[in-house]
Amino acid sequence: MRLENKIALITGGASGLGLATTERFVTEGCRVLVTDIQAEQGEELSARFGNDVLFRRCDVTREDEVEAAFEFAEQELGPIDAVFHSAGIIGAVGPITTTPGDEWRFSIDILLNGTFYAVKHAARVMVPRKKGSIISMASTAGLMGGLGPHAYAAAKHAVVGLTKNVAAELAGEGVRINAVAATGMATPMVAVSLTGDPSKIEEAKETLAETSPLKGRAGLAEDVANAVLWLASDESGYTTGHTLTTDAGLTVGATPEGPAFSEYQPLFREGGKRGLESS
């Protein structure tokens, strides 16, 4: 098993990407502390897995609660080997001219400040032991423009930058930090955006499959879980400061119709011929 006898802390682990990752980690021999604000779902998850999964309610915008969660995990489970910070929201959607300041601040608080708190306290417990893997949830919206609400995109760009900066700092301490950048995946959060109902994951999956660069293949929570598993395991032991994309090629220009700007290919070909003829 790839995480046998390992201990992990997963924020936002009661649903979506965090839940899929929790389930994947447990099958690989890991014991997990799940934190979330969804207490009922978290308690149900803990009951399902017994001693392999503990739950603690935690609001990631509260640094004191994040710090307490790390202390609880170390006390109840033992030294933390891996942290996956997946807690997040999509946030306010709309043009920049009408984006309310309070909604902007709320999104930044969860998506960026929450990441900072998780990374900070993960480093605090890992640096003295000179080992550990931290994984943050970024997004394709953090790698390119035109995707997602403005606050979400800004925060995810910042998460990518934070990952690089902290990796440079902690490499000498033996601690690794990476991020996973996903596109829209079939999760309750994305289902809300596409259908207005978090339970309509199958309907969201159909829409995602139709628009995916990998024609007919929707992105699944399990795809992200597998990426996080690799980054948490010793298999990625020489990888730090990296943002791993699970996006069906979106950020390299793949589209359902073929490569981005493929409509210009005939012009490029003709231009190339003219260039050869005139050379």
How would you name each of these model-derived features?
Residues 93, 240-279:
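Short C-terminal tail/terminal secondary-structure segment
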Residues 97-116, 131, 135, 159:
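Catalytic Tyr-X3-Lys loop
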Residues 179, 187, 201-235, 239, ...:
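C-terminal helical subdomain
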Residues 124, 168-172, 237:
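Alpha-helical segment proximal to the catalytic Tyr-Lys
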Residues 3-33:
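Canonical Rossmann dinucleotide-binding motif of NAD(H)/NADP(H)-dependent dehydrogenases/reductases
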